[in-house]
Amino acid sequence: MKKSLILMAAIFLFSASCDRSHIQQAQVPVPAGDSELDREIRRVMEKGINLEERKRQIPAIAVAFARRTEPQRANRLAALCYLKTLGTPFMPMDMAEIALTETGGHGLASKSVSYKGARGVWQVMPVRARTHGYSARDLQDDEKCAEAAVRELYSKLLMANGNLVKAKKLYCGWGPQANAYEARRRQYRKELLEEMTRFAQQGDIREKVARAL
């Protein structure tokens, strides 16, 4: 119930303001471990680094999602990208890129199923979901799918020795298909960065107008 209330509050705030996203923080625990990478993650998060940057990414993500699905759902998915990466080494845009690459061409549909059996917006394989504590049916729930996807990307990050770009490619797999996946992901990242730049420019204009008044 608490998680649902936090998510509802986040969606409301995103809908009310596209250039300002003040969201209640909700911790998503990083998988247990005591590697150097784990310790570095904890040090970074304890300093509260990147919270403002995280917030700045949300409007751009919502706009990009809204090109593929209805605005209300776009806001909800953008909220999940923010909330489910708190307390992890990932940024909202990392999960947004994966969602767009996996199901952006299918309306970011929660019931998407690949020919290999991957499910949900983030296309997690059921066998992998089970290792993170989720069932195949859970993956058709956007919130649970996002949680499973974050944990799956984290496992790939460990495999990639902390190389996030490589981890994202491993999220798809290996070989030519993974190469094509990586090319698409970079295109979606470019789209998101362009939207972030546009919002930043709009913010600068508003600030200049406010100073002139």
What do these predicted ranges mean?
Residues 4-13:
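Sec-dependent N-terminal signal peptides
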Residues 18, 22, 28-31, 38-213:
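Catalytic glycan-binding domains that act on GlcNAc-containing polysaccharides
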